[in-house]
């Protein structure tokens, strides 16, 4: 496991000859040094998780370890639109197959960003990122002696509730469920975009046994958007803290080809964007992550731009 900063990735177009505000994100990004303890006052902080060890363990296609830097490059040229600051905390890299150590390192960095008042946005990497992200949030809340409820909203074609071990990209929410049970805390998990053709009856049974609230992909289409947003708003109102995780394989393959398991149906990008904005403006979003972007299977950087667009919706 290694840590690396990414300042050289932030390059883009300069339009100083044009009138008005032409600032792009690469011009406002700041490298977040671990030794710096300056309060972040709610500023967004990017953190990469260069790992697809969990995808490999889950018999998927590798390549997501290269996702975070490709998403940064797509973000670099996005107009800032008045965003005062964006921070980059570098990458946690799992370069030796030791997934568990990488997840602990990720958790520590997420905890530290939260302690400074930042909003961590973790860029995966496989969806094994979720176990590290959640542990970081939980560690921060424990340090604050905060026993408030944590709602997890996962936009995903898969439950990721596999009970098999060792842990993989298919197990993070089962791991979280077990951790919540050990702590005597509720497991508040909403999974949106589940594909019945990509999850076995055993996984549906596991979700039912855990009391998971799930909505299948066919019921996440634009015609259902108003109802879905109202339901989510009610759930968010009833919680104290929100963790939003977006597995990019929830999107239709035509929109997001660059994942290990492209979706035949999927959730429309406009629907995912609306949910991201609902979370962002709720005042309860504590941490978010984007998982499974795999540049090896991208077309003309389409997937990177989609991931960057969703990232922007979460902090712009």
UniProtKB/Swiss-Prot annotation:
<dbReference type="GO" id="GO:0019557">
    <property type="term" value="P:L-histidine catabolic process to glutamate and formate"/>
</dbReference>
<feature type="binding site">
    <location>
        <position position="158"/>
    </location>
    <ligand>
        <name>Mn(2+) 2</name>
    </ligand>
</feature>
<comment type="similarity">
    <text>Belongs to the arginase family.</text>
</comment>
<dbReference type="GO" id="GO:0050415">
    <property type="term" value="F:formimidoylglutamase activity"/>
</dbReference>
<comment type="pathway">
    <text>Amino-acid degradation; L-histidine degradation into L-glutamate; L-glutamate from N-formimidoyl-L-glutamate (hydrolase route): step 1/1.</text>
</comment>
<protein>
    <recommendedName>
        <fullName>Formimidoylglutamase</fullName>
        <ecNumber>3.5.3.8</ecNumber>
    </recommendedName>
</protein>
<dbReference type="InterPro" id="IPR020855">
    <property type="entry name" value="Ureohydrolase_Mn_BS"/>
</dbReference>
<feature type="binding site">
    <location>
        <position position="156"/>
    </location>
    <ligand>
        <name>Mn(2+) 1</name>
    </ligand>
</feature>
<feature type="binding site">
    <location>
        <position position="156"/>
    </location>
    <ligand>
        <name>Mn(2+) 2</name>
    </ligand>
</feature>
<dbReference type="GO" id="GO:0008783">
    <property type="term" value="F:agmatinase activity"/>
</dbReference>
<feature type="binding site">
    <location>
        <position position="160"/>
    </location>
    <ligand>
        <name>Mn(2+) 1</name>
    </ligand>
</feature>
<comment type="function">
    <text>Catalyzes the conversion of N-formimidoyl-L-glutamate to L-glutamate and formamide.</text>
</comment>
<dbReference type="GO" id="GO:0030145">
    <property type="term" value="F:manganese ion binding"/>
</dbReference>
<dbReference type="InterPro" id="IPR005923">
    <property type="entry name" value="HutG"/>
</dbReference>
<keyword id="KW-0464">Manganese</keyword>
<dbReference type="InterPro" id="IPR006035">
    <property type="entry name" value="Ureohydrolase"/>
</dbReference>
<feature type="binding site">
    <location>
        <position position="127"/>
    </location>
    <ligand>
        <name>Mn(2+) 1</name>
    </ligand>
</feature>
<dbReference type="Pfam" id="PF00491">
    <property type="entry name" value="Arginase"/>
</dbReference>
<dbReference type="GO" id="GO:0033389">
    <property type="term" value="P:putrescine biosynthetic process from arginine, via agmatine"/>
</dbReference>
<feature type="binding site">
    <location>
        <position position="249"/>
    </location>
    <ligand>
        <name>Mn(2+) 2</name>
    </ligand>
</feature>
<dbReference type="GO" id="GO:0019556">
    <property type="term" value="P:L-histidine catabolic process to glutamate and formamide"/>
</dbReference>
<keyword id="KW-0479">Metal-binding</keyword>
<keyword id="KW-0369">Histidine metabolism</keyword>
<keyword id="KW-0378">Hydrolase</keyword>
<feature type="binding site">
    <location>
        <position position="247"/>
    </location>
    <ligand>
        <name>Mn(2+) 1</name>
    </ligand>
</feature>
<feature type="binding site">
    <location>
        <position position="247"/>
    </location>
    <ligand>
        <name>Mn(2+) 2</name>
    </ligand>
</feature>
<dbReference type="InterPro" id="IPR023696">
    <property type="entry name" value="Ureohydrolase_dom_sf"/>
</dbReference>
């Amino acid at each position: 496991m290694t840590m690396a900063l990414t300042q050289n990735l932030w390059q883009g177009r300069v339009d100083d000859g044009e009138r008005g505000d032409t600032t792009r994100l690469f011009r406002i990004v700041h490298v977040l040094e671990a030794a710096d303890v300056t309060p972040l006052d709610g500023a967004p902080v990017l953190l990469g998780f260069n790992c697809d060890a969990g995808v490999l363990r889950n018999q998927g296609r590798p390549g997501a370890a290269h996702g975070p830097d490709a998403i940064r490059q797509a973000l670099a040229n996005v107009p800032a639109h008045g965003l005062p600051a964006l921070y980059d905390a570098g990458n946690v890299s799992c370069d030796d197959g030791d997934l568990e150590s990488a997840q602990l390192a990720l958790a520590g960095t997420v905890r530290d960003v939260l302690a400074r008042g930042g909003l961590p946005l973790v860029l995966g990497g496989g969806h094994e990122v979720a176990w590290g992200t959640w542990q970081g949030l939980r560690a921060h809340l424990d340090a604050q002696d905060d026993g408030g409820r944590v709602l997890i909203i996962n936009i995903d074609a898969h439950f990721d509730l596999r009970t098999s071990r060792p842990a993989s990209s298919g197990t993070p929410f089962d791991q979280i469920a077990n951790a919540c049970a050990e702590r005597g805390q509720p497991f508040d998990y909403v999974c949106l975009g589940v594909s019945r053709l990509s999850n076995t009856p055993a996984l549906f049974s596991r979700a039912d046994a855990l009391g998971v609230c799930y909505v299948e992909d066919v019921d996440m289409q634009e015609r259902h958007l108003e109802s879905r947003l109202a339901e989510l708003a009610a759930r968010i109102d009833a919680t104290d803290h929100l963790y939003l995780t977006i597995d990019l394989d929830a999107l239709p393959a035509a929109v997001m080809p660059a994942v290990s398991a492209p979706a035949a149906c999927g959730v429309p990008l406009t629907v995912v964007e609306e949910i991201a904005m609902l979370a962002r403006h709720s005042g309860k979003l504590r941490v978010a992550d984007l998982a499974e972007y795999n540049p090896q299977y991208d077309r003309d950087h389409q997937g990177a731009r989609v991931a960057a667009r969703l990232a922007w919706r979460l902090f712009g």
